């Protein structure tokens, strides 16, 4: 799948601890190598009430993604207590 990054995702990534950042890098690589969301062996859940928005769980952090066809847009990465205030 094609992977894109929002400016807010890159900005959020600077504030994430190093060990979580390493796990996120592996997740991004796995997304690039997969053909669909179903191929990913990640903790992905659809955001209720939104058609194309999902979250990926990484420890106490959540990655907010948008899926359009074969493109994944990484929108936000925030702590679990604040992700749903800013995403989607």
Curated annotation (Swiss-Prot):
Quote the protein name from its UniProt record: Toxin RelE3
Quaternary structure, per UniProt, is: Forms heterodimers with RelB3 and possibly a heterotetramer RelE3-RelB3(2)-RelE3 from 2 heterodimers. The heterotetramer is probably not very stable in solution.
Cite the entry's keywords alphabetically.
Hydrolase, Nuclease, Toxin-antitoxin system
> InterPro entries, from UniProt?
RelE/ParE_toxin, RelE/ParE_toxin_dom_sf, TA_system_RelE_toxin
Superkingdom per UniProt: Archaea
Which Pfam families does the protein's record reference?
A: ParE_toxin (PF05016)
For this UniProt entry, the molecular function terms from Gene Ontology, in alphabetical order, are: nuclease activity
Q: Which family does it belong to?
A: Belongs to the RelE toxin family.
Q: Identify the Gene3D superfamilies for this entry.
A: RelE-like
Specify the effect of residue 62 to K/S.
Inactivates toxin
Q: What does this protein do?
A: Toxic component of a type II toxin-antitoxin (TA) system. Has RNase activity. Is very toxic upon expression in E.coli. Its toxic activity is probably neutralized by the cognate antitoxin RelB3.
Q: What is its EC number?
A: 3.1.-.-
């Amino acid at each position: 799948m094609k992977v894109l990054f929002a400016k807010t995702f890159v900005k959020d990534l600077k504030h994430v601890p190093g060990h979580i950042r390493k796990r996120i890098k592996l997740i991004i690589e796995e997304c690039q190598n997969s053909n669909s969301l179903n191929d990913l062996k990640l903790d992905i859940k659809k955001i209720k009430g939104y058609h194309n928005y999902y979250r990926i769980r990484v420890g106490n952090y959540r990655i907010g993604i948008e899926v359009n066809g074969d493109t994944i847009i990484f929108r936000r990465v925030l702590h679990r207590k604040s992700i749903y205030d800013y995403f989607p």
